[in-house]
Each structure stands twice: as C-alpha cells, then as structure tokens.
Amino acid sequence: MGMTKKLREKWNEALQAVLPIIAIVLVLCFVIAPISSSILLCFLLGAVLLLAGMMLFTLGAELAMSPMGERVGTCLTKSRKLPVVIGLSFLLGFIITISEPDLQVLANQVPAVPNMTLILSVACGVGAFLVVALMRMLFSVALPPLLLVFYGVVFVLAMFVPKAFLSVAFDSGGVTTGPMTVPFIMALGVGISATRSDRHAADDSFGLVALCSIGPILAVMILSMIFKADSSAYTPPVIPEIGDSKELFLLFARELPVYMKEIAVSLLPIILFFMIFQIFMLKLTTRKLKKIAIGLVYTYAGLVLFLTGVNVGFMPAGNYLGQVLAKSAHPLFLVPIAMIMGYFIVKAEPAVYVLNKQVEEITDGAISSKAMGMGLSLGVAVSLGLAMVRVLTGISILWFLIPGYAIALGISFFVPKIYTAIAFDSGGVASGPMTAAFLLPMAQGACSALGGNIVTDAFGVVAMVAMTPLITIQVMGLASRIRAKRGAQEGMSAARGQSGAYAAFELLDDDAIIEL
C-alpha cells in the first residue's frame, strides 16, 4: 500500500474518532453551555491539530514503534541470559518512563516531594514491574494471582496514605503509561511471545502495561508516607482571551516549541536504546532502518501536533464546560453528558488504536477491533459517570476503586486468560492524554464551580477511567466463554441425536430401509 493511501486511511480513522467529540462539544456550546468565542476558536483549531496528529501518530506507530518493540522483545528472549534480560528490562522501563512528558505534570502536583525524587522513584517502579512482567511471560506464570497480590498491597497501603493524596496516587498509574511508551511496551510483549511455541504464547502477549501501571501507584504512595505529604497542588488552566486570528495563531505558535522539546526528549532514549540493540544484536538492513526512521518522524510530528491541540485547545474548553454545566439549573446533567463524552473520547486516545489493532492481529480476529472499541467505550462512559457523581457528592474514591478492583480481580479467575491480560492492559491505555487534558479539567471545572475540594473530589478521573475497562472487557470474555460452552453442548446434542438415528437404521434390514 502506498504512503498516500495509508495516510488517507489514517485520516479517515482519525475523523471517525474525533468528529463525534467535536459535534458533542459544539452542540453543548450552542444549546446548553455557551462559551466565549476565544475558547471556541482555540477548541476548533486544537481539533484540527488533533486530527492531523492522530493521523501521523497511528501511521508512525505502525511503521516504527511497534516493529522496534517487537524486535527488541525477540532479541531479549533469544539472549538466554537471565541477568541480561532482567538488567536490560529494568533499564528500558526506567528510561522510557523518565522521559514521559506527563510524569513531570504529576511531579508538579505533589509539592511535598522533590520533583526529581518522585520522577526517579516512579521510573524505578515501572522498571521493576516491567522485569516482573517479562519474567511472568518467560516462565508462563498466570497473571490473575500476580494482580491479586500486587493490588492487595496497593489497597493495604491506601489505608495509610493521606486522604488529600489518594486520588493523585491512583491517577499516577494511568498518567505514566502514555502514548509514547504504551505502543513500545505492548510490542515488546508481542516480540517475546513470538519466540515461544506453546499454546499459551498468545495469551501472554498482553499484560505488560497492566503490571507496569502498578509500579507508579506504589512508588507515589510510599513517597507520600515517607515525606508525610498531606496535600497536592492544583493549577487551573488559563482561559485564553483571543482578540483576532493573529493572537490565536501566536497562542499555538508559542506552545508548539514546548511540545517539540518534550516529545524529542521522550523519543530520544527509546531511539538510543534501539540503536544499541541494532549495533550489537539486531543488525537490520538499511531498508528496514529507513522505514523505521520514517515512522519515527511521523510519530514525532504526530505527537507534537496532537499534544499541542489537546493541551492548548481542549483543556480550557473542558474546564470551562465543566464550570458552566455545574452552575446551570440542572447540575445533575453533568453525569449523562460526561458519560456520552467518555463513550466517544476514548476512541481518540492515540494508544487505543494501537491496542485494538494488536488485539485483532494476535487473536486472528477472534477479538475484533470493533468489539474492543465497544468494550472500552462502555467502560469509560461508566467511569466518567461515576467520576461526576464523586464531583457532585464528594464520596471518597476508595468507595469506587475497592469494589471495582474486587469485581475485576474476581472475574479474572473465570474468563479466558487472554481477556484478563487485555483488560488490565486496556486500563492503562484508555487513560491517556485525552482523559488528562479534557475530561480531568472538565471535572476540575465542575468541582471548582460547586465549591468542592478539587484535590480529593476531581482528581481520580484518570484512575476511574483506568478501572472500568478491566470489568467491561472481562465481561466480554465471560460472555464468549458462555457462548462457546453453549455451542459445544448444542453440538454434542446434535451429534447424539444423529448417532441415535444411525443406530435405529442399523436395527432395520435392507428391505425395511428401502420401504422407509
């Protein structure tokens, strides 16, 4: 397929994902929640950048990030030296986390803990859990018991974490698995499982993001107790005031270099890590390297445009919409509106496209992209509804997370293994930049307008979005298992009926059969 045709295909996919969000926001602006022309213009230009960014990023991930991850994973497994695998896995997890742009944002929300201490601790957490995830794959250890143990530790620690810090701690799991790291980590799993020939290899292709998401939560919780952090910080987004088209252009032009630098810093360690593998182990042909290089350029340009559009155009719009809806005569409308937004907005998360495509390929179409998309959308819709209930009532996040994870972990022992791994991966994937830069500001704006505690009541949206897909995707798996059993039983009944008919014929002589 030519590059122009591929770009057109990715553009159509981006349109399908983003147009519903634009339509919903415009309907809200013109019918229910009027906003200033400055915010609306920023939103519309941000939407154009988001569309272009998504198109380029999805193509770049396909050409570069996924092949790089798969080849590194295959290479790691073939080394056959456990200390080397452990050391390189930890280093890889550490490097790709420390360069994640959203980690700096998280660090700024925790003023009691020095930024560098928090960043290094979270990076170590991801590195350690990436090692655990790879060891699980290499030694074919079941995922549900591991998740039960580690989440058990998380919720025991939650009892000792300051209340004002709890939501931020749980948000950290989704924040640090961003669009830069997720495609690479997921492809790493595919590369490792490809070297195995047993029947559970496909099941173990997933689960890396699931375990890596736990590391930051534990790291942030432990730090909050060590430093006795009793508060976290919230800086409201600046609502832009645009006088003319030139000011609109300058607003985006000022922010563009910031994201160019951030994404360059994020991509560079991954490229260097891959080049070390290329020099000493992979030795790919010039043609393959050229294809990866082109893919990296697309990835870079796509993420720069995407993050500029989301953070400059979408964040102020989300915050202001939340304020207007909360101040309206019917603030309860926040719940259904947030659910509708959540249903569609997850489709615009860059890493969700990568996850859905990979799931369809690994399962040979048994779990389709459409089914995955539906499961994620329903999960995020429920999570946004619950998040707005928290904003309106001030209920502690633990009243939602403990039952939610208890259900998710309980179901995991009864569904096909691959569904559990995909479900827990999808939690980290769904809670990406669209959630952090549009849905979270919307909750913060609503909470601010209602006079609530933003730190305890509005933070936690990312954690809620990361939780509900664990249940919805596994319910899909449970339904598929029930259907398979029912089909098998019907097949056996039909076979028994058929064999009974043959037996009846055998009792008759030839003349009797002719008469029949």
What are these regions (language model features)?
Residues M1-L59, T74-C75, G173, M186, ...:
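Signature of multi-pass transmembrane helix bundles
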Residues I21-V25, G53, K81-S89, V149-F160, ...:
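Small-residue-rich segments of transmembrane alpha-helices in multi-pass membrane proteins
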Residues L41-C42, G60, A107-I119, R136-G152, ...:
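Transmembrane helix-loop boundary segments of multi-pass membrane transporters
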Residues E62-R80, V105-P111, F314-A329, A351-I367, ...:
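Flexible loop linkers connecting adjacent transmembrane helices
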Residues F160-V168, A219-K228, F306-G313, G385-L386, ...:
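Hydrophobic alpha-helical transmembrane segments in multi-pass integral membrane proteins
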